[in-house]
Curated annotation (Swiss-Prot):
Keywords: Cell cycle, Cell division, Chaperone, Cytoplasm, Isomerase, Rotamase. Residues 164-249 form the PPIase FKBP-type domain. Coiled coil: none annotated. This is Trigger factor. NCBIfam families: tig. Its EC number is 5.2.1.8. The gene is tig. It comes from Campylobacter fetus subsp. fetus (strain 82-40).
Length: 435
């Protein structure tokens, strides 16, 4: 088997060979001989099974194993020809051609390697920003929110239901005139405007009077968890029994202890300072996500140019396409299923964004290495568990779900990115005058 290989650029190489039928058959025969020594077939002693019997029973499996072995041989021989090591490879080689004719196989592969990333001078592209300011009014509003949060619910006498009120009501949902499982409850308590129910439901209850009944028309989101309801129109029959609300209490000693349970003798000044820092942190996070990160990303991909592994770019294109799939109409989905050329053309629209995303990922990875930024397994576990608690789901099941979907590396990368950007943008702060 003669292998030809050449570097396409610093991150990709092409390999080509033709495997003769005799070479493939020899591989299969050799594997069958090895298997015959250990395999057990009724009527034959262990180690005495004829090769012909092994081939008869396991021939197809052995042929697949032989092809896999040839595939590995091609990769290894290619690495020698282009002076690369197996540790340089990133991802799986892409099979561009695998044509079988008269027992011979014409194979073309593309092998990708970890890119050579240099980020010298990254300090020059860190955007400047001013420390977010926090006003007295913002602190007072936040304290008022906390006071309302811990206040008990009370029945409210008012004309009709408004945003922010708590509604005690009965409901039953129908799709195509039929009630569906899980779509009924009595005496249910819901904060109007909280977004707990499907879009349109809470808005449809606005203006409802105590004792009044109403049909609320909604449409389940296309990505709704229950597949049999996803995208369906529904009617919910609701009856309002009571309107409840919360009144902000006083900021007394007892309330301060509730709001700051870890402080021995909490004071209003301590609470204000803590809230001020939290508001500032929230504002900075917003600034980071909406302004600083995008600016840095645009400048980074423009400044740091390097060859990208094609297989990783292709994976990113596929991922972006899959993410967008749910946004297509039924007609569009049907068209893509039936028209391969239209599917290919649509997939190509994600290429530029995918290239930018992959490029930025490698830049972030290199910067994180230079700055010694890591995320431990314990930190990753805590983050996944915390997310589970926020959504009220079992943390162990949530972790297992992430493992099955292969999402843990992506979560870890996102955490490294967050640490990195918080570290980077410290040096971009040109003004720190507080209020």
């Amino acid at each position: 088997m003669e292998v030809k290989a050449k570097l396409l650029n610093t991150a990709n190489a092409a390999a080509q060979t033709e495997v003769k039928a005799s070479e493939l058959n020899a591989k299969v025969e050799n594997l069958a001989k090895k298997a015959a020594k250990n395999i057990k077939i009724d009527g034959f002693r262990k180690g005495k099974v004829p090769v012909a019997q092994v081939l008869k029973r396991y021939g197809k499996d052995l042929e697949n194993d032989a092809k896999s072995e040839i595939f590995r041989d091609i990769v290894n021989e290619s690495l020698k020809l282009i002076a690369k090591k197996s540790s340089d490879i990133i991802g799986e080689p892409m099979i561009l051609k695998f044509d079988e004719k008269d027992g011979n196989i014409d194979i073309e592969l593309e092998i990708s390697f970890k890119p050579e990333v240099k980020v010298d001078g990254y300090e020059e592209i860190i955007p400047e920003y001013t420390t977010p300011k926090v006003t007295k009014k913002e602190i007072e509003e936040k304290i008022n929110e906390f006071l309302k949060m811990i206040a008990p619910l009370e029945k409210v006498e008012k004309e009709s239901l408004e945003k922010g009120d708590f509604a005690k009501f009965d409901f039953e949902g129908f799709v195509d005139g039929e009630a569906f499982e899980g779509g009924k409850a009595e005496g249910y308590l819901l904060e109007i405007g909280s977004g707990q129910f499907i879009p349109g439901f809470e808005d449809g209850m606005l203006g409802l009077k105590v004792g009044e009944q109403k049909d609320v028309n909604v449409t389940f989101p296309a990505e709704y968890g229950a597949a049999h309801l996803a995208g369906k129109s529904a009617v919910f029959k609701v009856k309002l029994h009571e309107i409840q609300g919360k009144k902000a209490g006083k900021l007394d000693e007892e309330t301060l202890k509730k709001l700051m349970p870890n402080e021995e003798n909490p004071t209003a000044e301590q609470l204000e300072d803590r809230i001020k820092e939290q508001i500032r942190a929230d504002k900075f996070q917003k600034l980071l996500n909406e302004d600083l990160k995008p600016k840095f990303a645009d400048k980074a991909v423009e400044k740091f140019k390097f060859d990208l592994p094609n297989n990783i770019v292709e994976q990113e294109i596929d991922m972006q396409f899959r993410s967008a799939w749910g946004n297509f109409s039924e007609d569009e989905m049907k068209k893509f299923r039936e028209d391969k050329e239209a599917l290919k053309k649509q997939r190509e629209t994600y290429k530029n964004e995918a290239i930018k995303s992959v490029q930025l990922t490698f830049i972030i990875d290199e910067l994180a290495k230079q700055k010694g930024i890591t995320v431990s397994d314990n930190e990753l576990l805590q983050a996944v568990y915390f997310e589970a608690y926020r959504y009220g789901i079992d943390p162990k099941e949530h972790l297992e779900s992430y493992k099955k979907q292969g999402m843990l590396p992506a979560v870890k990368m996102a955490m490294i990115e967050e640490k990195l950007f918080n570290n980077l943008f410290k040096s971009g702060n040109r003004e720190d005058k507080g209020e």
